[in-house]
From Swiss-Prot:
Organism: Rickettsia peacockii (strain Rustic)
Notes on the domains: The N-terminal domain interacts with the head of the 30S subunit; the C-terminal domain interacts with the body and contacts protein S4. The interaction surface between S4 and S5 is involved in control of translational fidelity.
Protein name: Small ribosomal subunit protein uS5
Summary of the function given for this chain in its UniProt record: With S4 and S12 plays an important role in translational accuracy.
Keyword rRNA-binding: yes
Family, per entry: Belongs to the universal ribosomal protein uS5 family.
Amino acid sequence: MSKVKKNDEILSEVLVDVNRVTKVVKGGRSFAFSAYVVVGDKAGRVGAGHGKAKEVNEARGKAKQAAKKRMMKVPLYQNRTIHHDVVGKSGAAKVILRRAKAGTGVIAGGSMRAIFDSLGVHDIVAKSIGSTNVYAMISATFDALNKLASPKSIAMRRDKKVNEISVKSADIQVNE
């Protein structure tokens, strides 16, 4: 895992997948590399990107730039877990994300673990169902993260106060 500093922002980068791809041309085969990278600030922002080039380092650089462009903010509960359970789908891949008590840790498979580590989540239980393709699982995980909402945002949508939408929400300190 490497750190990238840009605009006073430290981002962690995780290389999730590297493939050698082949293009058959008139004169034979042309080889290139494909890379998939997850980038995050460990404080609630994460992004994923894909890049292709003739060299691995170039593909990784392109993937990193694509990931930075696609970064998104995710509301976290106490800066350690998600606010509520959520399901995400992408093609044949399906992921279930469940919030967890403090001290549980990150219980998730490979590519999902990279996302949660870059996001800054410390306690979560994640289960993948169906396809285990890296691209599909990351896409499904981002679909689930897009569906997350903090109690504050739900209250604003309903034109209510935070303590009116849930019995337990009066105890929640909103960190957005």
